[in-house]
Amino acid sequence: MPRLRLPDFLGLGVQKGGTTTLHQMLAEHPEVFLPEQKEVHYFSLHYAEGPAWYAAHYEALAPGQRCGDITPYYLFHPEAPARIKALLPTARLLVLLRDPVQRTLSQLFHSRRLGLEPLDLEAAIAAESQRLAGAEAVLARPDGRHGSHQEHSYLSRSRYERQLPGWQALFPPEQLLILRSEDLFTDPASIWQRLQSFLGLTPVPWAGELPRANAGSGEQATVPPQLRAWLREQLAPTYRAMEAGYGLGW
């Protein structure tokens, strides 16, 4: 029985942190194969389908190419670290982290645009803990899905210091690359070099044009200053932990 061809690397997140741009950038490299469908969601929504289902997304892989899966829900999904370790123990893991307050607001506006959030900003954040209650038990099942865990996890997804340790406990440092989303857009050439080195790709010069994806519509300018300040206060432990433990500041 032939060995299944499965991803060499994964983009774990974060949602609203530039993973669409990351996907477009990496897809330009001749040694990289990515499915046309950016978010495969095998380790989150389709785990019950089995590895053969996952491998089917990579049937068009050419000899010598490295393949990946960029699904930003993985970083936040409580079962993803162990599932990935079991199937892909040597995979390289990419993480883009955005300013926590900016990320929270971006997800809120994204959910509202898609019709997934009927509440206003303040009410949606206030309802989050109740909406997410019991999610981990549901998600422990191979076929488990929890709509609010995926769509209404505004503050929770931005608490990076609660998510990263689960990955670091299972994967050695050399398999995990953590980058600031902002650097992807302000210094793409440098990030491009780091990505190629981390993934073991033949260096290709950066073309100099960054794909534009999911551009905002200025909605964040409408956020009341007091709400933004409150969010910063709520996420203060995250800012401190990321600066102290990872050298990432916002």
What is each stretch, according to the model?
Residues 139-156, 215-227:
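Surface-exposed cleft-lining segments at the edges of enzyme active sites
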Residues 21, 79-82, 162, 189-190:
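Generic recognition of short, well-ordered alpha-helical segments
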Residues 100, 165-241, 247-248:
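The conserved 3'-phosphoadenosine-5'-phosphosulfate
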Residues 48-51, 77-78, 161, 225, ...:
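Structural motif corresponding to alpha-helix initiation and N-cap regions
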Residues 72-76, 156-157, 183-187:
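Acidic, metal-coordinating catalytic cores used for nucleic-acid/nucleotide bond scission
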